[in-house]
């Protein structure tokens, strides 16, 4: 077999192996996407309810009487400090990306939109503190001189509520210590398998303005809801506020992971389809070259036979 034919055959075999790998990766991503969508659907009910509770408490002016400057005697983070508003000197930005590649344009879109958000609202990188969830985002912002105040790598492909707790504790602690004066969560929101959109949600300080009143019915408009609280407003909020923060961060992670798996599945399908096209082209090239080689051999044999006669 001529060297050119051997090279084409080698490329065909190599591309077939690549196609098998990308097809397997597509199947895995599709399975993960299906699984995480079930988690996201069931979780959305809880997330909507906890947001509604905080919104109602805010509208009832229950949050106005809370002492947000008090310190816990046990040394734990003051969760009521999540309500404290102060002049903004530094903005904290949570950026959710993946730890690895092979996810199409997922990471690049989130990073690009986050950079635009920063550049449009801040004059210097010193005004921003990055909280990176995912190694891709952490590495990107470190290389460009940003202050990566906290990074969280190795989060599960199907994250659990427990995964968000240490992250939320760190976020609230840094806000309480005035590492930043406001906090936004930036991530890719899953729309459908082929579409996602960038979102930047304000998480801290907690206020009704951040959440809107979408969860309130029209019958609530114009009324001030009165609550009787036991044992106290502070005791209730010390339980509810961390749950709200955890729900917001976990919801964003869950949404971002859904978008990541969808992007990965689409990217691997595209890679598999491209590999099939390349294989078809190479096989056609191989068959033509082989046919040409056979024709040449027959011509040479016929010519040699004629010369002998």
Swiss-Prot record:
Q: Which InterPro entries match?
A: ATP_synth_F1_ATPase_gsu, ATP_synth_F1_gsu
Judging by the UniProt lineage, the source's domain of life is Bacteria
Q: Where is the protein found, in the record's own terms?
A: Cell membrane
Can you tell me which family this protein belongs to?
Answer: Belongs to the ATPase gamma chain family.
Question: What are the transmembrane regions?
Answer: none
Write one Gene Ontology MF term.
proton-transporting ATP synthase activity, rotational mechanism
Any one Gene Ontology cellular component term annotated for this protein: plasma membrane
Key words of the record: ATP synthesis, Cell membrane, CF(1), Hydrogen ion transport, Ion transport, Membrane, Transport
Organism encoding this protein? Ligilactobacillus salivarius (strain UCC118) (Lactobacillus salivarius)
What is the protein's quaternary organization?
F-type ATPases have 2 components, CF(1) - the catalytic core - and CF(0) - the membrane proton channel. CF(1) has five subunits: alpha(3), beta(3), gamma(1), delta(1), epsilon(1). CF(0) has three main subunits: a, b and c.
Q: How does it sit in the membrane?
A: Peripheral membrane protein
Instruction: Note the CDD domains from the entry.
Output: F1-ATPase_gamma
The record's function comment reads: Produces ATP from ADP in the presence of a proton gradient across the membrane. The gamma chain is believed to be important in regulating ATPase activity and the flow of protons through the CF(0) complex.
A Gene Ontology biological process term = proton motive force-driven plasma membrane ATP synthesis
Question: What name goes with this protein?
Answer: ATP synthase gamma chain
The record, for Pfam families, names:
ATP-synt
């Amino acid at each position: 077999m001529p060297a050119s034919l051997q090279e084409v055959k080698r490329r065909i075999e190599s591309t077939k192996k690549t196609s098998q790998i990308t097809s397997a990766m597509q199947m895995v991503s599709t399975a993960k996407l299906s699984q995480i969508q079930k988690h996201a659907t069931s979780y959305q009910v809880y997330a909507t309810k906890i947001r509604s509770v905080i919104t109602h408490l805010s509208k009832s002016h229950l949050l106005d009487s809370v002492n947000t400057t008090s310190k816990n005697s046990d040394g734990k983070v003051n969760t009521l400090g999540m309500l404290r508003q102060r002049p903004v000197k530094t903005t904290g930005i949570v950026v959710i990306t993946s730890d690895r590649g092979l996810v199409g344009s997922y990471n690049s879109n989130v990073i690009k939109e986050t950079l635009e958000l920063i550049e449009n609202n801040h004059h210097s990188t010193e005004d921003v503190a990055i909280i990176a969830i995912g190694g891709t985002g952490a590495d990107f912002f470190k290389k460009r001189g940003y202050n990566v105040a906290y990074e969280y790598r190795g989060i599960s492909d199907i994250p659990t509520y427990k995964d968000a707790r240490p992250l939320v504790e760190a976020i609230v602690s840094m806000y309480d210590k005035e590492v930043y004066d406001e906090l936004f969560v930036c991530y890719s929101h899953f729309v459908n398998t082929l579409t996602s959109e960038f979102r930047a949600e304000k998480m801290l300080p907690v206020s009704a303005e951040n959440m809107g009143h979408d969860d309130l019915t029209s019958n609530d408009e114009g009324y001030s809801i009165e609550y009787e609280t036991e044992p106290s407003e502070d005791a209730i909020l010390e339980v509810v506020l961390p749950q709200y923060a955890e729900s917001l961060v976990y919801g964003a992670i869950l949404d971002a992971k859904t978008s990541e798996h969808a992007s990965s599945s689409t990217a691997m399908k595209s890679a598999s389809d491209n590999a099939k096209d390349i294989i078809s082209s190479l096989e056609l090239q191989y068959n033509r070259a082989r046919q040409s080689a056979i024709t040449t051999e027959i011509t040479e044999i016929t010519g040699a036979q004629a010369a002998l006669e």
